[in-house]
Swiss-Prot record:
Annotated GO biological process: lipid A biosynthetic process
Native organism taxonomy: Bacteria, Pseudomonadati, Pseudomonadota, Gammaproteobacteria, Moraxellales
GO molecular function: N-acyltransferase activity
Keyword presence, Acyltransferase: yes
Protein name stated in the entry: UDP-3-O-acylglucosamine N-acyltransferase
Name of the gene encoding the protein in the UniProt record: lpxD
Any one Gene Ontology cellular component term annotated for this protein: membrane
EC number(s) on file: 2.3.1.191
Length: 356
């Protein structure tokens, strides 16, 4: 298969950059600084990468004007204000796109479902009653859309995904393999030593430009809907419980768990393995560092952390012993000791000043 080539001047135009060098050069792909060859385009995202750039074999470099001045031995550049953003834009040029349309013969589609003529439905896909699939949407093999599910335009649903509970996805949503959208929420009523299952009657609403990684679970609401607003991005292995509401452009890294009925604001970042208890509210523009545990509301923007960072094992053991010893001492006793020490210090300072 012939590899698609792109001219340097064409690529420069796509990122609204300034071309320096030979615009007719042809490029077959993007590559990292260390692995780039002469037919590859690469980028330099900061001064810390200049040493790698100086020895790179790449045919051209995406850089800022200031970074270019440090690479006098190189000839071909795309000058932009933000090299990383330009790189992100150009990845879509070189990405291998699925151009097929139509429905594969092994797919099982209910007669009432409405499937766009420009959509692609892969092998062994099952689509239930009253479903809708929009224009240019791709649904890969072995995926299941239960009854009353709606998928918008330009979406990509990877293989082995299950979308159920009447979930509604808007446009340009990407969902990766083995994720479940709209599964039954974890709702039970305790009575006389037993757990009584609560039927989950809500759904899941997913906005535009949402990306969800593989092996995630996003449960439908018990009564109200679970909601992901526009631009939310979610890594692999994330659990979002019933009735959770996530604000626009919030990013959630792998292994996070969000308990039911919690509301997370806009433009938040949850780093890896964060846990958020249920029925809480987190303000806009909050960042949680890795493995943070949230057990109360966060009402102000900022960066929050919890837990103890890594250090040498013997040191850690001694620290834990001291923490336990500290926990055994009543707080009032600690306060009295500190007050006594402070009084002694002030007395010594006073005596020292008198002797002067």
């Amino acid at each position: 298969m012939k590899v698609q080539q792109y001219r340097l001047d064409e690529l420069t135009h796509l990122v609204k950059g300034e071309l320096i060098g030979e615009g007719s050069l042809q490029f077959s792909n993007l590559a990292s600084l260390e692995n780039a060859e002469v037919n590859h385009l690469t980028f330099v995202n900061g001064e810390k990468h200049l040493d790698q750039a100086k020895v790179s074999r790449a045919g051209a470099y995406i850089v800022t004007a200031a970074l270019k001045e440090h690479l006098p031995e190189k000839d071909n550049f795309i000058i932009v204000d933000n090299p990383y953003l330009a790189f992100a834009i150009l990845t879509h040029v070189f990405d291998k796109k699925i151009s097929s349309t139509g429905i594969e013969s092994t797919a099982q589609i209910h007669p009432s479902a409405v499937i766009s003529e420009t959509a692609y439905i892969g092998h062994y896909v099952v689509i239930g009653e009253n479903c809708v699939v929009g224009d240019n949407t791709v649904i890969q093999s072995h995926t299941k859309l239960d009854d009353n599910v709606e998928v918008g335009k330009d979406c990509f649903i990877d293989s082995h995904v299950t979308i159920t509970g009447g979930s509604k996805l808007r446009d340009r949503v990407r969902i990766h393999s083995s994720t479940v959208i709209g599964g039954e929420g974890f709702g039970f009523a305790p009575y006389q030593g037993k757990w009584h299952r609560i039927a989950q009657l809500g759904s899941v609403l997913i906005g535009n430009d949402v990306r969800i990684g593989s092996n995630c679970s996003i449960d439908r609401g018990a009564l109200d809907n679970t909601i992901l607003e526009d631009g939310v991005i979610i890594d692999n292995l994330v659990q979002i419980a019933h009735n959770v509401h996530i604000g626009s452009n919030t990013a959630i890294a792998a292994k996070c768990g969000i308990a039911g009925s919690t509301k997370i604001g806009k433009n938040c970042i949850l780093a890896g393995a964060c846990g958020v208890a249920g029925h809480l509210s987190i303000a806009d523009n909050v960042t949680l560092t890795g493995m943070s545990m949230v057990t109360k509301n966060i009402s102000e923007a900022g960066t929050y952390s919890s837990g103890t960072g890594l250090f040498e094992n013997n040191h850690w053991k001694k620290t834990i012993v001291r923490l336990r010893q500290l926990a055994d001492v009543p707080l009032t006793q600690i306060t009295k000791r500190l007050d006594h020490i402070q009084a002694q210090i002030e007395s010594l300072e006073s005596t020292f000043n008198l002797r002067k």
